[in-house]
Amino acid sequence: MRPRGNTQEDYLLRIIRQAAELLRQLRRRLLGGEASAESIRQDAAVAIDFLLGSQGPVLGMLDAISAARLVGHPAIVELWCALLDVEAEAAEASGDPTFALRCRARALALRNAARMLWGETNPLAEGEPSSE
């Protein structure tokens, strides 16, 4: 009989894989020009909601350190940042540089917070699904 894995860890890995795939699709669409920047921006926001789950609204209001600590997993924080980067690129392309700047600033703050909490490691390069 196969030993059962940690259910919470399995769930996190599944969410990480699915969000990484959404990120790949969004990047492809953004680079390919096959969809409007506004639809990519909206889909990036939906992907962030999926990744963060019911805590998303609260996490969006917290400072970066508190948000990263509450997320609790460096790969999820990095995916969140990567999705914010896509959202920023799409906002820039759709003529909203102010929103793009806010997204980029939040991604930078979250990355810095993750470094403070977990060090310099790249969680997506160490056995987690790649977002590229």
Regions found by a protein language model. Give the residues of each.
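Short coil/turn linking the two alpha-helices of tandem helical-hairpin repeats
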Residues: 24-34, 88-91, 95, 114-115, ...
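The tetratricopeptide repeat
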Residues: 14, 21, 76-79, 83, ...
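Long amphipathic alpha-helical segments
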Residues: 61-65, 117-129
